Structure formats: structure tokens, C-alpha cells
Amino acid sequence: MGNCLKCFQSAAEQSMPTNASSPNSHNSNSNACQTATSLANCYESVGINPNANERCALETDELLSSRTPLKPAKANNCDTKRNSFKSLGLLNGSAPTMSDIITTAVQESMEVSHQTLSKLFDVYKDPDDEEMILTDGIERLCNDLNYQPDEFAILVLAWCLDASQMCRFTKVEFIEGLHKMRADTIDSIRVRLEQTIEMLKADAEMFKQLYRFTFRFGLEPDQRVLSLEMAIDLWKLVFTVQTPDLFSNWIHFLEKHPNIRRIPKDTWNMYLNFTEQCDIQNYDDTEAWPSLFDDFVDYEKSRALVSSGIHDDDNNNDDPLQSHVKAEDPGLVS
């Protein structure tokens, strides 16, 4: 489909006002019971709760409180540079897809009708392919959700639906994904997305699931590696709400070296580990990192020397990437 992100570049020109509605309260014998019941049924709201963002953490804790105790996150041997990605134990990260995570979180809440979801799908389906929502329909859906098509929230939506590729949602993906999310209106979809984004900010394992999905989501049909251009666009998108240290340096390094043509899956996956565990000073090139990371670290060290005035960059032709491109790394192509 070419550069699929360009399908999402049309800005939604209108904002859809949202109508607030509050969760139904249940009769109880005490104020404490009323509070607990209200939290436990917070997912029953099909309208936007104006206090959803403030209460997201409380809702999540209440919904998961009755589940089997989760295993504590394993300690990392290296210092984590992105502290905001430290797991807080909300989820154990074992679910293979976002649909499984959402199902676990809301499985005891309201049921939604497949018939209702089918009608919602019909609003956005393509007139020439009634089993698909394609670019025009996605843009209208984004507009109704009050998001731009290239926003982080739409990537999260694609993850929630377990979409197989960019620029389209199949009927099965749309209906089954929203059914597992327990969302059957535009307002309830937006609430679920807002809650999920807050959970992603707090839970590292959950973010890892989204991060790994993003690689698959960006692949062209029958391809196994991302083009460098697509990889850079997706890195910028997936790290919208949580930007790791040296991220701008990483992007600068990739853009400055046109002989880097593609990014394989292993390099994509291990970059997240790299951002969590290492920095330029404690990086160990004897460990099993992709050679592209070795070159990046060498490049950054050379830049640091130049900026400190130790040698003149104009006379320095010893670009580490140019001098020792490793042929075994499929991410580097001359």
C-alpha cells in the first residue's frame, strides 16, 4: 500500500462534541458500598465520563482487584533510563494481543450487541468493499472520535482491534475488537481509548505489547522488514506519549546515514530494551546487541568528542558506521 502512513495524513476538520453521562449507581447500605459499586461498574457507561481521565487509575485498580494476584515484575539488572515505563503491576503483560488485555479488564461488565456493532460498521464501510473500512471510512471514524488519523490514539485503536495492516479495518476486526473492548458507540470507544492510553503510560509490559504490534502493523504485505522511512515514522508515533532518552539522537543518526535501508524485527524489538537498559556510557558492545546499536553508540561518542573540541569534524572522516558496516546485520544495506 506504499507509504501507508500517508493514508492517515488527512486532518479531521471537525470536532465532535461529546455528551457526558455518569455511571448508574446501585442501591447499597453504606456510602462505602456505593463508592465500591460505582467503581466496579464504571465500564458500564456508554457515554463519555467528564472525570474519566482523573478516575482512570482508580477504575483500573477496582476492576482488577478481584483477579488472581499478578506476579511482580522482574527486576532489571541495568538502570532504567525511562522510569515512566517501569511496570506498576497493573497487568502481567502475558496477553498476546490488546483484545485479550481489554477482555480481561472488562469481561464482567456490560455486554454489547453484535447487531449494534454491525450497524456501526456500516456507517464507515467502503461502498466498493462492504467487508472493509478503508481510508475514507477511517478518516470519517477519526473525525467522529475527534482525533487526527495519525495520532497515537488511532494506533492504540488499531492495536485494540488487532488490525492486520494499515489503512483498513476488516469487518471481523472491527466487530470482534469492539466487542472485546465492550464499546459500541463513538463515545464509549473514545472512553476506552483514553483509559487504555493511561494504562500504557503506567505499565511497561502492556506498552511492550503495543510496541511489538506496531512493527507488524507497519509491514507491507509479504514483507518481513520495515523500510527505514516507515520505521522512523512508526518510532515517532509509538513514542508519542513516552519519549526515551536519546530518541532524537537515534532518529538523527538514522536519517544521516542513507545506507541504512531497512529495519528488521529483531532490531525493532531490541531498541525498546536498549532504551530501557542502556545509555552511551554504560553500553557494552560485547553483549548481543544488533551491530546498528554499536554504530549508533560509536557515532554519539564521536559527536561528543567533536562538541568538546578535541578534534575538528571537518577533518574527521572516520564515521563509525561507514568504517565498519557489518554485513551480517540485515538492517544495513549498502
From Swiss-Prot:
Promotes neddylation of cullin components of SCF-type E3 ubiquitin ligase complexes and thus regulates SCF-type complex activity. Function promotes cell proliferation. Residues 308-334 are annotated as: Disordered. Residues 325-334 have a biased composition (Basic and acidic residues). It is found in: Cell membrane. GO terms for biological process: negative regulation of cell growth; positive regulation of apoptotic process; positive regulation of protein neddylation; protein neddylation. InterPro entries: DCN-prot, DCN1-like_PONY, PONY_dom. The keyword Phosphoprotein does not apply. Residues 112-301 form the DCUN1 domain. This is DCN1-like protein 3. Keywords: Cell membrane, Membrane, Ubl conjugation pathway. GO terms for cellular component: perinuclear region of cytoplasm; plasma membrane; ubiquitin ligase complex. Gene3D superfamilies: Cullin, PONY binding domain, EF-hand. GO terms for molecular function: cullin family protein binding; ubiquitin conjugating enzyme binding; ubiquitin-like protein binding. Pfam families: Cullin_binding. Disruption phenotype: Viable but with decreased survival. Mutant females produce less offspring with wild-type males. No gross morphological defects and no effect on locomotor behavior. Ubiquitous RNAi-mediated knockdown is not lethal. Its main location: membrane. The lineage of its organism: Eukaryota, Metazoa, Ecdysozoa, Arthropoda, Hexapoda. The keyword Metal-binding does not apply.
